[in-house]
Amino acid sequence: MTNITTKTDDGICIVKINRPEKLNAMNIDVAKEIISTFKQLEKDDNVKVIILTGEGEKAFSAGADIEYMSKISPEESERYAKLGQELTATVENITKPTIAAVNGFALGGGCELAMSCDIRLASDNAKIGQPEVTIGIPPGWGGTQRLMRIVGIAKAKELVFTEIGRASCRESR
C-alpha cells in the first residue's frame, strides 16, 4: 500500500493518505487502500483508536482526483461513486473510535471522509467544504446526510445552499 501509511503506538493508529503532491486526492486505488486498512485495523486488538489524516500541511484530502476522474468512463465513474460510499460507510461503521485530524483542505470527498469519522479536529489552516455544489453536483458519498447529523438541518442547508465552500472551521460551526 503506497497511498496509505500507518503507524501504531500505544494503541493509537495514525492512518495517513500519502499523496501530498496531489493534495491527498483520492482515486480508486486510494479508496480501496483506505477500506482495506480500516478493515484490517478493525481486527487488530492492539489498535484502540484510529486517527485519519493527510500527509503534509496543505491537505487532509482535496477529494476526488480530478485528473483521474477526467480520464475514466461513465461506468468507471459510477463504480468509483459506489466505492466512495463503501469507503465512508466503512469508516463510519468501524467499532473503534475514529478521529479526522484535518490539516489544510478537506474538500468534496475529503470533507465527506472527515465527516465519516466520529470526531473531527481541525488545524487553524483547515478549509472544509463541498465545492461541487456550486456547479450543481450533490455530494455523492452520503455527505449531505452526515452533515445534517453533525450540524443540524438548518445549518446543513445554509452550508449546502450558500456553499460557504472552503469554509474555515470557525465558519462551519
Residue ranges, per PLM feature:
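Conserved CoA-thioester-binding segment of acyl-CoA-metabolizing enzymes
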Residues: 1-53, 75, 89
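Hydrophobic/aromatic residues within transmembrane alpha-helices
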Residues: 15, 52, 65, 113-114, ...
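A short, glycine- and basic residue-enriched loop/turn
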Residues: 20-23, 57-58, 63, 105, ...
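Phosphate-coordinating loops and pocket residues in cytosolic domains that bind phosphorylated ligands
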Residues: 25-28, 62, 71, 161, ...
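Short, conserved glycine- and acidic-residue-centered signature motifs
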Residues: 27-30, 80, 107, 140
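Hydrophobic alpha-helical membrane-association signature
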Residues: 30-34, 80-83, 113
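Glycine- (often His-adjacent) and acidic-residue-rich active-site loop
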Residues: 54-89, 106, 136
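Crotonase-fold acyl-CoA enzyme core
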Residues: 90-170
